[in-house]
């Protein structure tokens, strides 16, 4: 699974740097995108006895289904990588804001402002050597291209929350 993720990240990187992308901007059911992103991790949730807290959000997002799915999938992958007990909560605390919150190890305050930089792994990534420093950078690039925002809140020992702002900024529906 890890090799597949690295290959996917390289392909995303190359596609984002090309002159044309394959964005299909439409109105999509966010719950369908979330379920498709969660599905590949079901075995890991079960095997590691981590809980997934998720209630359908009943939200329609103007986005690209495949690319937003990539972002959600990568955020889930990171959350699972750094969470040893407890679980992950997917919610919409404010209209148009998707939250993915974990009970993992959290991110050091000095690392938090840099986690979306290309190649930055931070203390956690350097310690366990399971980080390429490219995933969250790609998530930021995809969100920027889609007119979405992505931000992080975290505290060591308390977990991390990634928020994806889905309100439309400059997107035209096909």
What are these regions (language model features)?
Residues 18-23, 56, 60-63:
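Conserved micro-motifs of the catalytic ATP-binding
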Residues 79-80:
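Short helix-loop "hinge" at the ATP-lid/N-box region of the Bergerat-fold HATPase_c
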Residues 87-97:
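Short beta-strand/loop element within the Bergerat-fold HATPase_c
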Residues 102:
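Acidic ATP/Mg2+-coordinating residue in the GHKL
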Residues 107-120:
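Short conserved segment of the HATPase_c
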Residues 120-130:
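Glycine-rich ATP-lid/hinge loop adjacent to the conserved G-boxes
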């Amino acid at each position: 699974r890890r090799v597949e993720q690295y290959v996917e990240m390289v392909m995303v990187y190359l596609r984002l740097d090309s002159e044309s992308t394959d964005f299909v901007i439409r109105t999509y059911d966010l719950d369908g995108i979330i379920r498709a992103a969660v599905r590949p991790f079901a075995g890991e949730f079960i095997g590691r006895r981590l809980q997934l807290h998720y209630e359908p959000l009943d939200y329609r997002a103007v986005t690209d289904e495949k690319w937003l799915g990539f972002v959600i999938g990568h955020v889930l992958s990171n959350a699972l990588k750094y969470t040893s007990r407890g679980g992950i909560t997917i919610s919409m605390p404010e209209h148009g804001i998707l939250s993915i919150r974990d009970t993992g190890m959290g991110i050091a305050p000095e690392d938090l402002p840099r986690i979306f930089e290309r190649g930055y792994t931070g203390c956690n990534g350097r310690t366990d050597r399971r980080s390429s420093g490219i995933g969250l950078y790609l998530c930021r690039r995809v969100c920027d291209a889609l007119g979405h925002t992505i931000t992080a809140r975290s505290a060591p020992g308390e977990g991390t929350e990634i928020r994806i702002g889905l309100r439309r900024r400059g997107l035209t529906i096909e």
